[in-house]
Amino acid sequence: MYKNAEYLLEKYVEEKDQDKFKILEKIYVPNAKVTFEIDTDTISFPTEILGNKNIAQVLSAEFNRKYDHVQTYYLSRSFPQINDFTISNQGWLVIMREKEDNSIRVGTGLYDWIFEKQVDGNLKISQHNISIGVMLCLPGLPFSFLNELQSKLPYP
C-alpha cells in the first residue's frame, strides 16, 4: 500500500487536510513521534506528540476543528532523500481559513521524516518533525481570495 516515500507523503497531506484522521493514523507506526519547532506566535502545537492515534487526533481531527479549506503543498516534487528511510528539509506551504474569524492563514516551513519498513514491505512514518517558520494571518479578505490562491497550485 505505502511502498514508497513519495506516495506516503501525498497520503499524509490528503488525510491531514481532509480530516481523515482514522486513515492518517495508519500511516504512522503505533509508537511514532512528532516534534515541532515553531518560530511564530500565530499558531501553536504541543512540543511533541507520541503515538499514531494521538498524532492523527492532533494533526487532523483537532486541527480541522479550528481550520477549514486546508490545503498543504510541497514546495518541490523532488523529495530531498538522505537515504531510503529519511527525508530532510522538505519545504511545505499551507493555505487555509480559520473558522473562528474567517481569516486566511498562509504558512510555510520544513518537514523531516524517518520511515520504517514494515514486515509486509510497506513504509510507515516513525518520526516526523514539523518546523513552522511563518504563519501569516490575513483578516478581512474574501473567501474568493482563498479559492484563487489554492486554485493556482498543484495539490498535493
For each predicted feature, which ranges?
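Short, low-complexity N-terminal intrinsically disordered segments enriched in polar/charged residues
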Residues: 1-14, 18, 22, 26, ...
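Terminal "cap-and-tail" regions of soluble proteins that handle hydrophobic small molecules
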Residues: 2-10, 98-104, 114-156
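Conserved aromatic-histidine-acidic binding/catalytic patches
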Residues: 12, 16, 43, 47, ...
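A solvent-exposed, acidic/Ser-Thr-rich amphipathic alpha-helical stretch
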Residues: 30-91
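Glycine-centered flexibility motif
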Residues: 51, 107-109, 154
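Short, solvent-exposed secondary-structure boundary motifs
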Residues: 63-69, 99-106
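Hydrophobic/aromatic beta-strand elements that line small-molecule binding cavities or substrate pockets
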Residues: 73-79, 108-117
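Eukaryotic helix-grip
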Residues: 78, 84-92, 103-110, 127-135
